[in-house]
Every structure is written in structure tokens, then in C-alpha cells.
Amino acid sequence: MIKEIVKESEKGILIDIEVTTNAKKNEIGKINEWRKRIEIRIKEQPIEGKANKAIIKFLKGIFKSEISINSGTTSSQKTVLIPDKTKEDVVKILKKEIKSI
């Protein structure tokens, strides 16, 4: 399932995520198999881009890499771009972080 969520593109690696805001803490949850997305919980509220900034900062810390939101800036369903990692690196990091694996 994780390999369906993590995709290669010309610009780098894309990850499909589902964001929940107003969480108790920032964390990676489980894989939502129905939506084929990784659940991300963020403490910030989705006001004036605060949640998007928090997502980028949180994922930068996990992947030790630049992160940008490729699509879904105004949606809870987003796709993030990691330009300087391989798919294998990203999958390995996610397997360590995801609660259901």
C-alpha cells in the first residue's frame, strides 16, 4: 500500500497525505487504505496557512529535506513534494514513522 502513496515524478517524490488539524501533537498516523493517503496530525488550525506551514516544518524534520505542498493547499487532502530523496529513502523513513506498519 505504501508504494501506491509514494510516487516518483520529474521533480522528485510525491506523497499523498490526509491532514487533521487541531491535534494534540504533530505526528504521522496510519495509512488510510480507502483514500490511499498517509494520515498526518497537526496542532495548528487551518487559518491563514498556519497548518500548511506546520506540515512543511514537521515533515522537513522527519525527512531532513526540503518539502513543498504540490497540491491541495486549501484541502485536507494534499500531495507533498520531496525533491532530493529517492523513493526507497522515503518509503524507509515512512515505515519507521507510520503507526500501523
UniProtKB/Swiss-Prot annotation:
- GO cellular component assignments: cytoplasm
InterPro entries, alphabetized: DUF167, YggU-like_sf
Q: Which domain of life is it from?
A: Archaea
Stored SMART domains: DUF167
**Matching SUPFAM superfamilies:** YggU-like (SSF69786)
- Pfam families documented for this protein: DUF167
NCBIfam families in alphabetical order: DUF167 family protein
What PANTHER family does this protein's entry cite?
UPF0235 PROTEIN C15ORF40
Q: What is stated as this protein's family in its record?
A: Belongs to the UPF0235 family.
Give the protein name, as stated in the record.
UPF0235 protein MmarC6_1603
Which organism's genome codes for this protein? Answer: Methanococcus maripaludis (strain C6 / ATCC BAA-1332)
